Amino acid sequence: MLERRYIYPGIIEMNYQAGHRLGCNIYLIDGGSEWLLIDIGYEDTVDEIIDLIRQMDFPLAACKTLIATHADADHVQGMTKAQDILKTSISGHPLAVEPLASGDPVMTYAEIKAQDIFVEMKPCQIDTLIDEGDIIQVGDKQLEVWHTPGHTNNQLALRIDNLLMSGDNIYRDGCVGVIDAHHGSDIPDFIQSLKRIRDSDISWLLPSHGPIFKKENALLEKTIERLSEYQFMSDFGTCAVDWPLLQAWDREITEGRYPKIEPMRTD
């Protein structure tokens, strides 16, 4: 049996578990009697992820659901393959249904012609709709669903205790998920989602890309100010050629450096 590397009681991040970067961050929520996955990444890493789950001695039949934080291909391209293996349901926001069902290459960010990016996005069916305020019970764990639009209109975040699996809302370096009108991004909505995170009692952010990090309101405020300026900049756009955070992330994973988050005190 492979040792389970919990970053917090009941939470395993599969990149940390693997010791190398598989793609987007994939969170396994261990509720004891059952478990679920938040995102799955690309199809070509599904077999490795499920093999890791087997090696950690999680019964595959005990997978409650696969949650799509949003409809982007880098998070969900492997969903149908994983569903076929695990014989479970796929859960996501109502606004993710159509782009996933149609495999829309623009709305799922599977195709970016200007950057010569193309990922085959097979149609994917959401079985269970989840939205703002819903509670997902998985064994002895509860996840609270937040709808945090901005990067996409179907972006979800999931709260457990004082941790937020925050999707593509913000990363450790203050960057945010790509903003693209063709992809359904909305800057005013994004600002409101970031303000909600800033004003919450969340202590730790578990993003969909890059390292887990402690919530710092100064970082959030700086990002909010930057996005507020974007609303009035006609030259706004992103054609980034590199993202140094992912290089740092690679080093931290391979060196086994990851945060050990203390359980939330209830007294």
Question: Can you say where each PLM-predicted feature lies in the sequence?
Answer:
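C-terminal regulatory/interaction regions
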Residues: F236-D267
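Conserved beta-strand hairpin/beta-sheet module of binuclear metal-dependent hydrolase folds
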Residues: L2-M56, A157-G167, Y171
